Amino acid sequence: MKAALFVGGWQGHAPMDFADWYKALLEANGFQVDVYETLEPLERPEDLADLDLITPIWSSARSGHREEFGNMTKAQEDGLLKLIGNGCGLAGWHGHMGDAFRDRPTYHFLIGGQFVAHPPGWPDNLQPDDDYVDYDVTICQPDNPLVRGIRSFRIRSEQYYMLTDPSNNVLATTTFSGDHLWWIEGTVIPVTWTRRWDKGRVFYCSIGHELDDLKLPQVTEMIRRGAIWAANGKRAA
């Protein structure tokens, strides 16, 4: 199987460190992996038609942030939509996929959600050290092959508050305490989900601010299974 990683955006999320780890994970599972530090190849989807999987590792790319973060053009978005619609899989995590390309609403329709906050921090919080909380991740479909055998777990990281598509197939959730924003107490937000985009399969997990988050065994296994599942969409069609 062939995968392409598109790596860039905010360096605070250390995109290349994540790309190196993820590339090794995919290669250990039989993938041939190409890494691009530009989105320009998406403008020529016909050249990428043999891909089985795309993963964006490109966070905080929007016009309100610095120009060097990069952004996605309409032509690049159209190319991505065409590739996924034709059966290529899409898989990713955290802000690298869920807080990217905010100027492209159809991109967020594609992935099924959008990051909006991580209480007590906000998207523009100037004290990021205040953003970490201990929170539970609850596996809500224990018989689903993507999470079978993975137990619910606790993690200390950014707890992503997401706006999500109700058509998502939710595999794991988290519940907000209200300790920092009282009015969201008890709110259940998806953490991991799958969805379809025409012939393509989409997988997302909101965990992953630090690379060590993805190295947690439960998270590594969800990412591994999710990527393989997404990449097999063409074969299942």
Positions of predicted regions on the chain:
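Helical hinge/lid and interdomain linker segments adjacent to catalytic or ligand-binding clefts
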Residues: 2-5, 15-92, 96-99
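Stable alpha-helical elements in mature extracytoplasmic
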Residues: 18, 22, 76, 103, ...
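Oxidoreductase and adenylate-handling cofactor-binding alpha/beta cores
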Residues: 107-113, 152-169, 208, 220-233
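Catalytic beta-strand/loop cores that center a nucleophilic Ser/Cys/Thr
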Residues: 26-27, 50, 121-198
